[in-house]
Amino acid sequence: MADRYILAVESSCDETSVAVLKNEKDLLSNIIASQVESHKRFGGVVPEVASRHHVEVVTLCIKDALSEAGIVAEQLDAVAVTYGPGLVGALLVGMAAAKAFAWAHGLPLIPVNHMAGHLMAAREVQELEYPLLALLVSGGHTELVYVSEPGNYKIVGETRDDAVGEAYDKVGRVMGLTYPAGREIDELAHKGKDVYDFPRAMIKEDHLEFSFSGLKSAFINLHHNAEQKGEVLVTEDLCASFQAAVLDILLAKTKKALERYPVKTLVVAGGVAANQGLRERLAEEITDVDVVIPPLRLCGDNAGMIALAAAIECDKKHFADLDLNAKPSLAFAGFEE
């Protein structure tokens, strides 16, 4: 049987990425052009700046991905692209590039949900056993997803307000940390102690929804009150206390979901899945199911994960026409026309 090659494009936020996947899960290349330095001074992603950067580098990323993979366009079997959720301008740049490439080379177009990409990045670690449960944690999303079979997703719990990654960045900004703040808070937390009493919203309630706005507000209020009184707070202890509250919430809801949905596999994915504290707590507290976490290089936004999700859609022949539009608020579901 001939090898199958998929070119994947990801541009939903502030990373321009293009990857080439051979067959089901052999990533031959995964080019990532990060914009972090451009957004640091703003303390967050500026949509217009992100879009302009995507325009500047997406064509070069495609060229580099093919070159690193050691193949030419004529060997490709399909082109995959993130069509949501994300920043509409950023999505449109990647989609325009992917659609133009697909049209020019007569290739079918595979639309991929960005969050499905995060989840399916776990396929590179091992073959996933279905049904499974996934905890997806990133800058824009915090959700528990039940996956009955490949490509069939159902949200069973999600945040009512801030995503967990968003909360990290906001408290990091208050402390004067560099954007994005997640890694630095995690490192500082390992040097501090959980001495500040932050709220764990809805942790004892039976539903599977999350809330981080109260925790974020409590943190900001404590920090501002200390500043006004001239009190000195220990940054390491602040980070340790904040992270302990976040992880208590995530673990409590995940355990409830595992009780409600008996599965053998838990996938934990998204940018926040790179958090060392989260990985440690998962290893300590969830031992009765197989916990699968993508490697660090596939936790943040990248086209490799989009290609891994696209392979499943390609198997099902879920292709889109070239009039496919960006869906910045795309709901997590199966294939959407």
Swiss-Prot record:
E.C. numbers: 2.3.1.234
Keyword Endoplasmic reticulum on entry: no
Family: Belongs to the KAE1 / TsaD family.
Official protein name in the record: tRNA N6-adenosine threonylcarbamoyltransferase
Pfam annotation, one family: TsaD
PROSITE patterns: GLYCOPROTEASE
Main localization of the protein described in the UniProt heading: cytoplasm
Residues given in the record as Fe cation binding sites: H114, H118, D301
Keyword Metal-binding belongs to the record: yes
Compartments reported by the entry: Cytoplasm
Encoding gene, per UniProt annotation: tsaD
CC cofactor note: Binds 1 Fe(2+) ion per subunit.
UniProt keyword list: Acyltransferase, Cytoplasm, Iron, Metal-binding, Transferase, tRNA processing
UniProt enzyme class: transferase
GO MF annotation terms: iron ion binding; N(6)-L-threonylcarbamoyladenine synthase activity
One GO cellular component term: cytoplasm
Cofactor(s) listed: Fe(2+)
GO biological process, one term: tRNA threonylcarbamoyladenosine modification
Superkingdom in the source lineage: Bacteria
Stored NCBIfam families: gcp_kae1, T6A_TsaD_YgjD
Amino-acid positions noted as binding substrate in the UniProt annotation, renumbered to this chain: L136, V137, S138, G139, G140, D169, G182, D186, N275
Organism: Streptococcus thermophilus (strain ATCC BAA-491 / LMD-9)
